Amino acid sequence: MVSYWPVLIVLCLLPICHAKSYFADFVNGKGPFKQADALKFMDKMTILNKLQADILGIPQPDEFSALDFEDKIESKPDEIPYLFEGDMVLTDEQMDLIIKNVRDQYWARKSSTNEFLYAIRGKRSMTSFLSERWSFPVPYYIDTSSGVNTNAVLAGVAKWEQETCARFTRLNSYSSSSRQNALRFISGNGCYSNIGKVSRFPQDVSIGWGCTSLGTVCHEIGHALGFYHEQARYDRDDYVSILTQNIQDMYLSQFTKQSASSMVDYGVGYDYGSVMHYDQAAFSSTGGNTIATRDPNFQATIGQRVAPSFADVKRINFAYCNSTCSNYLDCQNGGYINPNDCNNCKCPPGFGGQLCDVAGTNSNGCGAGDITATSSIQTISASGALTCNYVIKAPVGAKVYFQMTAATFSRYSPCTTNYLEINYGRDFSRVGARFCASYPTISLSETNTLVVIYKGVNGARFSLNYRYDPVTFSTSAPTTTSTTTTTAPITVPTVSPTTTTTRQTTTTARTSTTTTTTQAPPTTTTSTSQCASWSACSAQCGGCGTQSRRCGTYVETVYCNTNPCTGGYCCRPFFYVTSFGTGYCRRPGADTPAAPQRYVEQRKG
């Protein structure tokens, strides 16, 4: 076992002993553990850290550093280095089980067969042990003598009661010897909580300095109700990558995965927008990201601490409230019967109505929320301090093509106060991709439904083009005769390596004229005598294709055929704009075609 007494001696020789020392408080029993339990817990954290290093295939980490603890807690009070995953107080039994599970993961990686068997056991994010679930109402006591922010605690409790069937009852007095399950809210060193109900005694939930936002209080209460962190789910590798090069090696244990058997999900998938998700730079040693989302469009979505997400609430309701309503409603789009109102469905963001089958209520100035996509480009836009919900429907069998053509938001990560959320996936119960500092790198929904949510403040705005895809999709009913009818696609003449752009302009005399210009691909410093001819463009319109040519040891490529496709659409990096009634494809930040991209051709053999 590792001894921490030498660390304490060094700590007390430093000037930090004359100020507040979180580490000294912790190992001296002034934190969430008694002194002996604190030292035992840190020994097990060291074991866990080394196991995690083995799993990740990196050198064995250094021992814990007390000085690092002080800076970390001051800057991020929900990332306490000597607690599991930064803010979780575990019992001895829970810690032993996690170490066992991490050992299982290590050996599973040694065998693809074992890894497969381990993987199919389930996808979970909440404690599966029924003994750790609460009975309602949950008694709680606010220890004002500790300096805890009473209003912050009450707001967090009220939020969970508003969204779920969970109920709490406030106690007027508290005894440390009371043999009663209860939550005691204190102002400790940082933010922390146990996982679920852990004993027949009151358990502490610390809402310390820097922990008083509604989302953070809800996060800690979420742990007490049984939540693990979202990025600790067994299936997290399908959704995020852990960037170990940016994690200080002594914090590797903060990125462990739970086993499938220790958590239960209730069919609610991985949610990037969960209030239980780490932010992108959690436990960073470099200031760089430690978590990268597999779909880069969700990078600015992870780590919000505003409020529980729809999926967070859904898990709690499924865990605790399934027997609340006896009636049946055909809830749509990921909605479910509201345990606080059994006559209506609880709807995911963007949706409303009794059955979640229409767009949610819009603020004045948003326009209609339920929209039907056609084969022609249409536009939605909004600006200012509004919340707008748009549900764009394409015909069944088609998809929704979209392009965000303009956006002005506060550039923060994660996107929390103002952003455009685009849910292009299949499961609308999970938060969509949020954009406040970037544009989407995707332009097609997975189904025939696209959900767009604008959350604005003064000065914010957005504009988004949409249509259904493909533009040749037939919306007519299929024929019942034995004759087979085939609709020929629209024929577009093959275009040579030179491209022609036609724009309509208006003179001062209000007469319309048409100007046609022909432009060859941009030239480079390489003599054209050294280059072969340009290849045919790989697509016929919309800047969707490229053409290439060989110039000595280089190959040059350039976008081509940037005239809009039928129905008015363009491929990335172009977007469709109109000028005086004529549409064309424009590349952001440029009014001329891009110079060819060059690379050295890799020859085989």
Swiss-Prot record:
* Superkingdom of source: Eukaryota
**Which positions are cleaved off as the propeptide during maturation?**
20-124
Tell me the ranges covered by the TSP type-1 domain, including all copies.
525-566
Comment on bound cofactor? Binds 1 zinc ion per subunit.
Q: Which residues bind Zn(2+)?
A: H219, H223, H229
Which compartments does it reside in? Secreted
Q: Which residues form the EGF-like domain?
A: 317-357
Which InterPro entries does the record associate with it?
A: Astacin-like_dom (IPR034035), CUB_dom (IPR000859), EGF-like_dom (IPR000742), MetalloPept_cat_dom_sf (IPR024079), Metallopeptidase_nem (IPR017050), Peptidase_M12A (IPR001506), Peptidase_Metallo (IPR006026), Sperma_CUB_dom_sf (IPR035914)
One annotated Gene Ontology cellular component of this protein: extracellular region
CC cofactor:
Zn(2+)
Keyword Disulfide bond on entry:
yes
CUB domain sequence ranges? 366-469
**The protein's enzyme class:** hydrolase
Q: Keywords, A to Z?
A: Cleavage on pair of basic residues, Developmental protein, Disulfide bond, EGF-like domain, Glycoprotein, Hydrolase, Metal-binding, Metalloprotease, Protease, Secreted, Signal, Zinc, Zymogen
Ranges in coiled-coil conformation? none
Q: What does this protein do?
A: Metalloprotease. Required for normal hatching and migration of neuroblasts. May act by degrading eggshell proteins at hatching.
Q: What is this protein called?
A: Zinc metalloproteinase nas-34
This chain's source organism reads: Caenorhabditis elegans
The record's gene field reads hch-1
